[in-house]
């Protein structure tokens, strides 16, 4: 198992300070620990609840891109399933990749930086891998009662509807990753 974990962290650092090099190697290992154990190991960063949020997903992908970019594409694609059709996103990550929860306690939250993380992560992914085709991948939109960028409630929505945006005839609506990016970037204006 030691060999396995050493292969997972395949980034080396060489500075004048061996302690700093070791620390940076440890930081590179954090995304693996987060995926296994959640964020509870960083209580001073408000992760003490043990949950993972929107930023966590994308920042983990950024870190993993340094070590294993080929396997990050599927994660990025699933992450876009947390975007709502109004450009906002689910704030809490459920169990497993691509499973989202609107929020923890019924309070609508729209964060200014949430559209930034998918954009810069996808950009780095494309630059690292050359996989521009990811922009064409079809992904569903997240749906819950929040609408109009968290300022209104969709009174027609209920749990039976599910958490995917649907068309008028009840089919799950999908849009390309590029569409998701554009909606997130432009809907705030």
Predicted regions: what they are:
Residues 1-49, 145-147, 152-168, 172:
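Acidic/polar, glycine-enriched structural segments that form the non-catalytic walls/loops
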Residues 10-39, 48-55, 79-115:
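Aromatic-lined, polymer-binding surfaces characteristic
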Residues 28, 56-58, 186-189:
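Generic detector of bulky aromatic hydrophobic side chains
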Residues 56-66:
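Non-membrane alpha-helical segments in proteins
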Residues 64-72, 76-189:
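Aromatic-rich carbohydrate-recognition surfaces in CAZymes
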């Amino acid at each position: 198992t030691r060999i396995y974990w050493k292969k997972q962290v395949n980034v080396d650092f060489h500075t004048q300070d061996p302690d700093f090099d070791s620390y940076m190697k440890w930081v590179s290992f954090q995304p693996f620990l987060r995926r296994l154990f959640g964020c509870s190991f960083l209580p001073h960063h408000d992760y003490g609840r043990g949950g993972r949020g929107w930023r966590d997903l994308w920042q983990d992908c950024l870190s993993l891109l340094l070590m294993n970019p080929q396997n990050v594409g599927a994660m990025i694609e699933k992450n876009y399933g947390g975007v709502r059709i109004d450009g906002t996103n689910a704030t809490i990550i459920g169990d497993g990749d691509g499973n989202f929860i609107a929020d923890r306690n019924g309070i609508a939250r729209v964060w200014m930086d949430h559209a930034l993380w998918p954009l810069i992560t996808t950009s780095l992914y494309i630059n690292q891998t050359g996989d521009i085709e990811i922009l064409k991948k079809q992904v569903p939109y997240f749906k819950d009662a929040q609408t109009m960028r968290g300022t209104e409630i969709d009174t027609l929505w209920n749990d039976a509807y599910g958490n995917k945006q649907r068309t008028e005839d009840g089919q799950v609506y999908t849009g390309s990753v590029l569409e998701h990016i554009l909606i997130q970037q432009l809907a705030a204006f």
